[in-house]
């Protein structure tokens, strides 16, 4: 044992508790052999003999123990100290539950299970009375498996399937399937609100061990597996009206169109829609206008008609033909050219021209491009789409255009006349 240099200098502040040898001090054995208490006032920095920092055995740091954040006097006690906040943790046994649900539980474990079940019942009551989205999964504890019997379906998935059934004129099957899912949710909520012995055992088993959750129904190429009679909302076969009928089976990522309409990125259906007869990327109808498409073919970014539309068609977005073309079509000139039959990136008209093109049947123009980029043609090409003649404006609209600034509530919705523009 090394000799304490501070003891030799007469200023060792640890006394008999010093780890080094104090020669001539009560047997010269150092402080560890005969730990005796000293008056608490003999050290200059407030260290007393009751401190465990320099005890015979090195004490581990208090942070090395996996103590719960909530603070518990019994460190080996499973607990649900933060269950109400949704962030419960445990350190020894899963959720404070015994491995055998039928085994006798300690009072602490029984208290934790009772608190868990009461929280589930309360959550079900709030879920039912609050009007929250019912097609969702549920877990009483954060970062733990979901309780079986619930289906996770987003509003967008419901909307997509609604439009798919709308195009097939089979809304009754859609309504029947949704109603079955609603009834299934209500039955499961009622089961969890009024728990019996068998339901409690199954519920505690779900919370502790978890159940094999089904894969999401809305997946690329995924098949739906039922979990506690939950079909996962899927609508594929319109001939059947049960809840198992819903399914988002996909064969292609970005391709879908109804019969007779071209698809945007391929001919295989994207979300269970019927296969298309023509494709946006094909030899007969170039998708982006690199080539000379036929007059009857469709540009892939055209919003002219249901049969000549790719983005906004019933196949891609699930919208019916009447909804796909109504809000999008507007009397504006194409941005990158457009003729009387095919549009480039806008809504074509019979006399629509732009500053970069002349009337042409191509998407980006053909041989007329050599004469369409002049400054004179860009001025001449302007028509009534961009400007409003004076005779078509009311007196109030004309006054607003002639004034220095608009009046709130009287701003015209029409373009101004060309004569009033100062360039």
From Swiss-Prot:
Top-level taxon: Eukaryota
PANTHER family: NUCLEOPORIN NUP42, NUCLEOPORIN-LIKE PROTEIN 2
C3H1-type zinc finger segments: 1-25
Gene Ontology biological process terms in this record: mRNA transport; nucleocytoplasmic transport; protein export from nucleus
Organism whose genome encodes this protein: Homo sapiens (Human)
Tissue specificity: Ubiquitously expressed.
UniProt keyword terms in alphabetical order: Glycoprotein, Membrane, Metal-binding, mRNA transport, Nuclear pore complex, Nucleus, Phosphoprotein, Protein transport, Repeat, Translocation, Transport, Zinc, Zinc-finger
Region Interaction with GLE1, residue ranges: 365-423
Subcellular location: Nucleus, Nuclear pore complex; Nucleus membrane
InterPro entries the UniProt entry points to: Nucleoporin_NUP42, Znf-CCCH_4, Znf_CCCH
Protein known as: Nucleoporin NUP42
GO MF assignments: nuclear export signal receptor activity; RNA binding; zinc ion binding
Stretches for region Interaction with HIV-1 Vpr: 94-170
PTM statement from Swiss-Prot or TrEMBL: O-glycosylated.
UniProt biased composition (Polar residues): 40-69
């Amino acid at each position: 044992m090394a000799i304490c240099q501070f003891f030799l200098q007469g200023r060792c502040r640890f006394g008999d508790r010093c780890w080094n040898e104090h020669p001539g001090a009560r047997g010269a054995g150092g402080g560890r052999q005969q730990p005796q208490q000293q008056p608490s006032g003999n050290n200059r920095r407030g260290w007393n003999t009751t401190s465990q920092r320099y005890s015979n055995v090195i004490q581990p740091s208090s942070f090395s123990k996996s103590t719960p954040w909530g603070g518990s006097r019994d460190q080996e006690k499973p607990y649900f100290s933060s269950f109400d906040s949704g962030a419960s943790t445990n350190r020894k046994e899963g959720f404070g539950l015994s491995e055998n649900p039928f085994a006798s539980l300690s009072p602490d474990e029984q208290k934790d299970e009772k608190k868990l079940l009461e929280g589930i019942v309360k959550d079900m009551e709030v879920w039912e009375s609050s009007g929250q989205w019912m097609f969702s999964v549920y877990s009483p504890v954060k970062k733990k498996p979901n309780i079986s019997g619930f289906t996770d379906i987003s509003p967008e998935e419901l909307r997509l399937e609604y439009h798919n059934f709308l195009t097939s004129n089979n809304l009754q099957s859609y309504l029947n399937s949704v109603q079955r899912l609603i009834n299934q949710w209500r039955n499961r909520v009622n089961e969890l609100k009024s728990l019996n012995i068998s339901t409690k055992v199954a519920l505690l088993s779900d919370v502790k061990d978890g159940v094999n959750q089904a894969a999401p129904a809305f997946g690329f190429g995924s098949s739906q597996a039922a979990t506690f009679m939950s079909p996962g909302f899927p609508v594929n076969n319109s001939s059947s009206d049960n809840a198992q009928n819903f399914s988002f089976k996909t064969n292609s990522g970005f391709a879908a169109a109804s019969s007779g309409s071209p698809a945007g990125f391929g001919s295989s259906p994207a979300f269970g829609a019927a296969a298309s007869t023509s494709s946006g990327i094909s030899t007969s109808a170039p998708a982006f206008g690199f080539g000379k498409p036929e007059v009857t073919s469709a540009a892939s970014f055209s919003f002219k008609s249901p049969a000549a539309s790719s983005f906004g068609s019933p196949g891609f977005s699930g919208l019916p033909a009447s909804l796909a073309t109504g809000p999008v079509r507007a009397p504006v000139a194409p941005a990158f050219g457009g003729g009387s039959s095919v549009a480039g990136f806008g809504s074509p008209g019979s006399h629509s021209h732009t500053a970069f093109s002349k009337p042409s049947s191509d998407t980006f123009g053909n041989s007329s491009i050599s004469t369409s980029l002049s400054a004179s043609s860009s001025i001449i090409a302007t028509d009534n789409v961009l400007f409003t003649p004076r005779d078509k404006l009311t007196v109030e609209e004309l006054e607003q255009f002639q004034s220095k600034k608009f009046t709130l509530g009287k701003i015209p919705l029409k373009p101004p006349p060309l004569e009033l523009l100062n360039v």
